[in-house]
Amino acid sequence: NYKDRYMLTGTFRADGSSRFTNDKWGYFPSIAAAWTVTNEKFMKNQKLFSEIKIRASYGLIGNQDITPYSTLGLMGSTSFNYGTDTNYTGYWASGLATPDLTWEKVKQLDLGIDLGFFDNRLTVSLDYYDKKTSDALLQQTAANYLGGTKYWVNAGEVSNKGLDISISGRILQNKE
């Protein structure tokens, strides 16, 4: 924060997860900046706005919400006796190996402006967002001849874009 006009923040995360076999680490940076225009000298004599703040942020986050050990190839067993006193053990693939499964990644850009009127008794916020999910974690089912088991894959991308508008008013306000 510089002179209550310019704000800048950033983070960097390195997250490790034992839920993934080969690609355990995900790296997730983010940055945000804001400019309070009404705190500039050239805005001091205007009376219309009590606040103008322009905001922008960009970040990357990860998702590792899968069942532990689900990237390993696992075997299941059961016993059959075929109508006799002797039990025979049968095996099947109860979990297919997916060693290259990796973090689901979400990239998001936000651009916004906050406007205040009448000593901030009326405020308006406009926000544009663009959110893209890649390497989405999806559980699929193997064919029956492979055991019919479920396994995780990185499949697909999702994109969301939109505009959020918020209007707030403080009709009654005590002077404190």
Feature annotation, model-predicted:
Residues 1-176:
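Extracellular/periplasmic, surface-exposed regions of secreted and cell-surface proteins
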